[in-house]
Amino acid sequence: MSFEPKNFKATEPKALPVILMLDGSSSMSSNGKIESLNKAVDTMIQKFAEEPRKDMTILVSIIIFGGKGAHVYMEYTPVQKLVAEGFVPLRAAGRTPMGAALTLAKEMIEDKNRTPSRAYRPAVILVSDGEPNDRWEEPMQAFMEGHSAKCQRFAMPIGDEANRSKAIRQFLGEEYIENLYYADEAKDIADAFSRITMSISERVCSRDPNVIAMTRAAAPAAISQQVPKPKVELMPDDLAEEF
């Protein structure tokens, strides 16, 4: 049987989804926090777009919680497209409905039309400068069940109030507590986000991106005082092909 190029279908790159759950409440508008966060997100996208692998595509989605609720600010978008079109900066206003953001993130992860099971294990990043002011406990419990429970999780509390947040620490749990990157103030956001970007990039460059590289977060002080040391944690065999 002769080879027919028209019948040949190239394998599509496998996706590594990255979901950013970002605090867009009014408190983020003070002291340059939202501006610093916008720059950090844009830099993360630029760095992801530089990754050389052709058999993988990094998809970034943004969920913002602020105003009167939470909404999907940006559906999954390939980083190359984001670089070409430009990242639209976030604005800050309103309250801190983190529970609503968790619900949206779970819906996105559980929906196979949006997050296919063939994709690599998603990375979910939670950023906030305070405690949630909605009913977050049930959405948090729901997030820790099903497909969403298998995600790699990071958190970046900004300031003392967020660093004491029960919700942020519950989001990480014991499994990912070392993925807490504390930003004392706006100027520390870029450094914290850079460390998270580096951790995800390590997965991209690894032989098996479903092997999660854990990193030791900096202590709740100036982030630059401590450099994280990598620690490797293997996924269970039954999760190796799909998350």
Set out the residue ranges of the language-model regions:
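Short, well-ordered amphipathic alpha-helices
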Residues: 41-49, 103-112, 138-143
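Von Willebrand factor
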Residues: 11-74, 81-121, 123-127, 154-169, 187-192
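Surface-exposed acidic, glycine-flexible loop patches that form ligand/cofactor-binding
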Residues: 2, 7-11, 49-54, 110-119, ...
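VWA/integrin I-like adhesion module and closely mimicked acidic/polar interface patches used
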Residues: 35, 130-174, 183
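Von Willebrand factor A/integrin I-like adhesion domains
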Residues: 160-213, 217
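A short small-residue
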Residues: 18-25, 82-89, 175-176
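Extended acidic, low-complexity intrinsically disordered regions
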Residues: 159, 208-243
